[in-house]
Amino acid sequence: MLDVKLLRNNFEEVKQKLQNRGEDLGEFEKFGELDKRRRTLIVETEALKSQRNEVSQEIAKLKREKQDADAKIEEMRVVGDRIKTLDIELREIDEKLDMILMSIPNIPHESTPVGESEDDNVEIRKWGEVRTFDFEPKAHWDLGTDLDILDFENAAKVTGSRFVFYKKLGARLERALINFMMDLHSNEHGYEEMLPPYMVNRASMTGTGQLPKFEEDAFLIEAEDYFLIPTAEVPVTNYHREDILKAEDLPRKYTAFSACFRSEAGSAGRDTRGLIRQHQFNKVELVQFVKPEDSYEALEKLTSNAEEVLRRLELPYRVLSMCTADLGFTAAKKYDLEVWIPSYDSYREISSCSNFESFQARRANIRFRREPGSKPEYVHTLNGSGLALGRTVAAILENYQDADGSVRIPKVLQGYMGGIEKIELPK
C-alpha cells in the first residue's frame, strides 16, 4: 500500500509512474476525485462544528440571562443534522479510498527499466555455459517418466492436471535439494530457518498484497476462510504483522521451505507438460526485514544468495532486471533469475527477488523504532525464491542427462543423496 500523503502531495508524479507500469488509471483518477471531495467535506464539517461551538456558548448565555434561545437551538439542530450527513458521507468516502488504495500497485524505483512488455526486461548478467549436446536431449517430463522418478499420469488420476508424484530417486533428489538449499541459506547466508503454516487468513493475504486484487489466483478453504499459501512469503512476512521491531534487531532474515499452491488462473494452455507450472510445488523462500536506507543493498545480496544455489548446482542462468510493465503488483524493483532449460531452448524463470520498500509493511503494519521512545517507521521488506524446487529438478534432469538416458547428480548434491552419482534407467 502506498503512503496516502505521497498520493496527495505528488499526484501527477505518481500518475506518471503508474502510467509507466501500463496501469489503467481509472481507479487512480477516482482516488483523486474522491480525495478532493473528502477535503471539501472536512473543511465544511470543521466550519460547522466551529459554528456549533460558538452558537452553543451563545445559547448557554441566553439561557443564563433568561432570554429566548429557541431560534438558536433550531439553527443548531439543522447544523447538527448537516454534520451527521457529512460524517456519514466522509465515512463512505474513506472506505472507498481505502479500497482504491489497496488496488493501486507499488511505484517503480527510479532504477527500474521503463518498458511496455517482458521484451523490455534488461539482462544484467549471465553465468555458466549452455551445454551443446551430441545427441537428441529429452525433455524432463520424458526423462522423469523413463527413469520412473516422476509420475504425471497417476497424479492426474488421483487429483487432476498440473500435479505430479515424485518417486524413488526423484523424491530423494527433491529432498536433497531442499536440505542443500536450507543448509546453504541458514549456515552460510545468515538466514533464520522457519517451517511455516500452509494455510493463512485473509489478513495475511492482504498484508503481502495477494488480496483483494488477486483472489482468483488463490485456493480458498471456504469453510474456514483460510487460503492455501501461494508462497512462504505470505506467512513469513506476516509473522511480524502489527509488530514494532527494534532497530538493532534489523535486518531480520528468514528462510523457509514450504509447499506452494496456485490456481494458475489465466495460464490455460501454457506449460501444460512437466514441472514448470504446477498447482502444487515446493519452494525455498528468502524474506528480509530491513531499514529503509539499507533495502537496495539488501536486494543485491539477496539476489546473490539465490544465484549461489544455481552456481553450486552448476546450472547456467541469467539475471534480468524486470521492466515497469513486468514488475508485479507489490515490487518497486525486481530481478528474475532464469535457468537454461534445453527442451525450451531458452532460459526460464526459477526465482524472483524483489524489494517492496514499505508497500507490504504499510499493509501489514510492520514497523521499527530507531531509538527507544522514537516514532515508529515502516520497515522495508524483501523476498526471493531460493529456489523453486520443481523447476530446479527440471533443470537438473535436462542439463545433466547423458546419451544413455541416465542423469548425473550434481556434485554438491551427492552427499545429500548418500553418495549416489547417477540416476539410471530401470533394468
From Swiss-Prot:
Record organism: Listeria welshimeri serovar 6b (strain ATCC 35897 / DSM 20650 / CCUG 15529 / CIP 8149 / NCTC 11857 / SLCC 5334 / V8)
Swiss-Prot/TrEMBL GO biological process terms: selenocysteine biosynthetic process; seryl-tRNA aminoacylation
Function: Catalyzes the attachment of serine to tRNA(Ser). Is also able to aminoacylate tRNA(Sec) with serine, to form the misacylated tRNA L-seryl-tRNA(Sec), which will be further converted into selenocysteinyl-tRNA(Sec).
Gene that this polypeptide is encoded by: serS
EC annotation from Swiss-Prot or TrEMBL: 6.1.1.11
Protein name per UniProt: Serine--tRNA ligase
Source organism, top-level taxon: Bacteria
Keyword Secreted: no
Sites where the protein binds L-serine: 231-233, 285, 385
Catalytic activity line of the entry: tRNA(Ser) + L-serine + ATP = L-seryl-tRNA(Ser) + AMP + diphosphate + H(+); tRNA(Sec) + L-serine + ATP = L-seryl-tRNA(Sec) + AMP + diphosphate + H(+)
